[in-house]
Amino acid sequence: MALLARVAPGRAPDGRAFRDALGRFATGVAFVTAAPDGEPAGLIVNSLTSVSLEPPLVAFCPSHHSLTWARMRRARHFGVNVLGRRHERFARCAARAGADRFADLSWETGRGSVPLLTDALAVLECEIVAEHPAGDHSIVVGRVEALRTSDIDEPLLFYAGMFRALQ
Protein backbone atom coordinates (compact mmCIF):
# COMPACT_ATOMS: atom_id res chain seq x y z
CA MET A 1 0.00 0.00 0.00
CA ALA A 2 1.38 3.41 -0.98
CA LEU A 3 1.97 6.00 1.70
CA LEU A 4 -0.20 9.08 1.81
CA ALA A 5 1.25 12.22 0.27
CA ARG A 6 1.16 14.86 2.97
CA VAL A 7 0.18 18.44 2.25
CA ALA A 8 1.86 21.18 4.28
CA PRO A 9 -0.55 23.20 6.43
CA GLY A 10 -1.94 26.19 4.55
CA ARG A 11 -0.97 24.76 1.14
CA ALA A 12 -3.29 23.26 -1.45
CA PRO A 13 -2.54 19.77 -2.76
CA ASP A 14 -0.95 19.46 -6.18
CA GLY A 15 -3.65 19.33 -8.89
CA ARG A 16 -2.49 15.98 -10.27
CA ALA A 17 -2.35 14.39 -6.81
CA PHE A 18 -5.84 15.72 -6.07
CA ARG A 19 -7.22 14.23 -9.33
CA ASP A 20 -5.48 10.92 -8.62
CA ALA A 21 -6.96 10.77 -5.13
CA LEU A 22 -10.50 11.51 -6.34
CA GLY A 23 -9.97 9.05 -9.19
CA ARG A 24 -10.01 6.31 -6.57
CA PHE A 25 -13.72 7.01 -6.08
CA ALA A 26 -15.60 4.98 -8.71
CA THR A 27 -18.51 6.81 -10.33
CA GLY A 28 -21.14 6.20 -12.94
CA VAL A 29 -21.06 8.08 -16.23
CA ALA A 30 -23.90 10.25 -17.53
CA PHE A 31 -24.61 12.27 -20.64
CA VAL A 32 -26.26 15.54 -19.59
CA THR A 33 -28.29 17.04 -22.43
CA ALA A 34 -30.22 20.20 -23.21
CA ALA A 35 -31.61 22.04 -26.21
CA PRO A 36 -30.58 25.68 -25.99
CA ASP A 37 -32.17 27.58 -28.86
CA GLY A 38 -33.72 24.28 -30.00
CA GLU A 39 -30.33 22.72 -30.88
CA PRO A 40 -29.26 19.52 -29.06
CA ALA A 41 -26.20 19.82 -26.84
CA GLY A 42 -24.65 17.49 -24.30
CA LEU A 43 -21.65 16.75 -22.16
CA ILE A 44 -20.26 13.70 -20.40
CA VAL A 45 -20.17 13.95 -16.59
CA ASN A 46 -19.18 11.71 -13.72
CA SER A 47 -19.91 14.36 -11.10
CA LEU A 48 -23.61 13.47 -10.83
CA THR A 49 -25.15 13.09 -7.38
CA SER A 50 -28.54 13.01 -5.72
CA VAL A 51 -29.18 16.03 -3.50
CA SER A 52 -32.67 15.52 -2.07
CA LEU A 53 -35.52 13.02 -2.15
CA GLU A 54 -38.20 15.58 -1.29
CA PRO A 55 -38.23 17.40 -3.56
CA PRO A 56 -36.24 15.13 -5.90
CA LEU A 57 -33.05 17.05 -6.74
CA VAL A 58 -29.83 16.11 -8.52
CA ALA A 59 -26.61 18.03 -9.13
CA PHE A 60 -23.69 17.90 -11.54
CA CYS A 61 -20.58 20.05 -11.87
CA PRO A 62 -19.59 21.38 -15.31
CA SER A 63 -16.32 23.23 -15.83
CA HIS A 64 -16.34 27.00 -16.22
CA HIS A 65 -14.18 26.38 -19.31
CA SER A 66 -16.78 24.19 -21.03
CA LEU A 67 -18.06 25.87 -24.19
CA THR A 68 -20.84 23.28 -24.32
CA TRP A 69 -22.06 24.17 -20.83
CA ALA A 70 -21.88 27.87 -21.74
CA ARG A 71 -24.49 27.08 -24.43
CA MET A 72 -26.52 24.58 -22.38
CA ARG A 73 -27.01 26.87 -19.37
CA ARG A 74 -29.34 29.04 -21.49
CA ALA A 75 -31.88 26.20 -21.46
CA ARG A 76 -34.33 25.87 -18.58
CA HIS A 77 -34.45 22.07 -18.73
CA PHE A 78 -31.81 19.36 -18.98
CA GLY A 79 -31.73 15.59 -19.20
CA VAL A 80 -29.53 13.14 -17.35
CA ASN A 81 -28.88 9.97 -19.36
CA VAL A 82 -27.14 7.28 -17.27
CA LEU A 83 -24.82 5.37 -19.60
CA GLY A 84 -24.34 1.61 -19.83
CA ARG A 85 -21.34 -0.44 -20.96
CA ARG A 86 -22.65 -0.33 -24.52
CA HIS A 87 -22.03 3.45 -24.47
CA GLU A 88 -18.28 3.30 -23.73
CA ARG A 89 -17.17 4.12 -27.27
CA PHE A 90 -19.68 6.96 -27.42
CA ALA A 91 -18.51 8.32 -24.03
CA ARG A 92 -14.87 8.32 -25.17
CA CYS A 93 -15.75 10.29 -28.31
CA ALA A 94 -18.25 12.63 -26.65
CA ALA A 95 -15.79 13.57 -23.90
CA ARG A 96 -13.61 15.31 -26.52
CA ALA A 97 -14.17 18.98 -27.31
CA GLY A 98 -15.81 19.58 -30.67
CA ALA A 99 -17.24 16.05 -30.99
CA ASP A 100 -20.58 15.51 -32.75
CA ARG A 101 -22.21 14.11 -29.65
CA PHE A 102 -25.51 13.14 -31.28
CA ALA A 103 -24.23 11.26 -34.34
CA ASP A 104 -25.32 7.63 -34.33
CA LEU A 105 -27.41 8.02 -31.16
CA SER A 106 -31.01 6.94 -30.77
CA TRP A 107 -32.81 9.74 -28.95
CA GLU A 108 -36.21 11.29 -28.49
CA THR A 109 -37.35 14.70 -27.30
CA GLY A 110 -38.48 15.38 -23.74
CA ARG A 111 -39.57 18.48 -21.79
CA GLY A 112 -38.12 21.68 -23.18
CA SER A 113 -37.07 19.81 -26.36
CA VAL A 114 -34.33 18.09 -24.32
CA PRO A 115 -32.73 15.14 -26.19
CA LEU A 116 -33.11 11.89 -24.21
CA LEU A 117 -31.35 8.64 -25.10
CA THR A 118 -33.73 5.78 -25.82
CA ASP A 119 -31.26 3.14 -24.57
CA ALA A 120 -29.95 4.76 -21.36
CA LEU A 121 -30.06 2.86 -18.06
CA ALA A 122 -31.93 5.77 -16.52
CA VAL A 123 -33.22 9.08 -17.85
CA LEU A 124 -34.07 12.02 -15.62
CA GLU A 125 -35.87 15.06 -17.00
CA CYS A 126 -34.95 18.08 -14.89
CA GLU A 127 -35.53 21.78 -14.52
CA ILE A 128 -32.59 23.94 -13.43
CA VAL A 129 -33.34 25.42 -10.00
CA ALA A 130 -29.90 26.74 -9.03
CA GLU A 131 -26.35 27.22 -10.24
CA HIS A 132 -23.57 27.99 -7.78
CA PRO A 133 -19.96 28.91 -8.63
CA ALA A 134 -17.47 26.56 -6.97
CA GLY A 135 -13.81 27.09 -7.85
CA ASP A 136 -13.27 26.35 -11.55
CA HIS A 137 -16.63 24.56 -11.84
CA SER A 138 -20.31 25.27 -11.20
CA ILE A 139 -22.70 23.21 -9.11
CA VAL A 140 -25.91 22.89 -11.12
CA VAL A 141 -28.98 21.72 -9.21
CA GLY A 142 -32.00 20.35 -11.04
CA ARG A 143 -35.46 19.31 -9.88
CA VAL A 144 -36.41 15.93 -11.35
CA GLU A 145 -39.76 16.24 -13.13
CA ALA A 146 -39.91 12.80 -14.77
CA LEU A 147 -37.78 9.66 -14.96
CA ARG A 148 -37.57 6.19 -16.38
CA THR A 149 -35.22 3.25 -15.80
CA SER A 150 -34.13 0.16 -17.71
CA ASP A 151 -32.21 -3.03 -16.99
CA ILE A 152 -30.97 -3.48 -20.57
CA ASP A 153 -27.28 -3.18 -19.71
CA GLU A 154 -24.70 -2.99 -16.92
CA PRO A 155 -23.56 0.50 -15.89
CA LEU A 156 -20.54 2.22 -17.38
CA LEU A 157 -18.14 3.17 -14.59
CA PHE A 158 -15.22 5.59 -14.35
CA TYR A 159 -12.31 4.75 -12.06
CA ALA A 160 -8.67 5.90 -11.97
CA GLY A 161 -9.07 7.86 -15.20
CA MET A 162 -10.49 4.93 -17.17
CA PHE A 163 -13.89 3.59 -18.15
CA ARG A 164 -14.65 0.30 -16.41
CA ALA A 165 -17.37 -2.33 -16.06
CA LEU A 166 -18.76 -4.18 -13.06
CA GLN A 167 -17.01 -7.48 -12.39
Model regions: which residues?
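Basic, polyanion-binding surface patches
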Residues: 1-167
